[in-house]
Amino acid sequence: MPRELPYVPKQLIVKVFTVENSTFLAQLIGPVFIVMGVGMLISPRNYRMTAEEFLRSRALIYIAGLMALVPGLAIVLTHNVWIFDWRLIITVLGWLGVIGGVFRLLFPQQVTAIGSMMLARPEWLRAPGAVVGALGLVLAYFGFVG
């Protein structure tokens, strides 16, 4: 006869799953964002050249749309946590991936226009680099330490 498991409230199961999920996603996204942020800050010229090449290619815009939409949707489906703590960062990043992916897939000409406008201002690479790096540090901290 199989042993019966003790009763565990559903809210506790969901919360444990979400915390484990959050930690994994923070460990995954945090270091990537740190590297991206540092790269944008120490070599903005390389990022600018990459962005200019990207904006000249509809195929790359399309692929980038898919590469933003798929993981963004995966995050939204598995981590749609609207609690005001560090986990909200992951949820917002998921939704930004979905929105950004859809925008790239449906409106590639607007992506080119907006991207070209942003590249015309050098500070538009340094400021996002600092933000991305800071988000990476926060996520890495909570993913590995906190």
Task: List each model region and its residues.
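Membrane-interface extramembranous regions
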Residues: L5, P9-G146
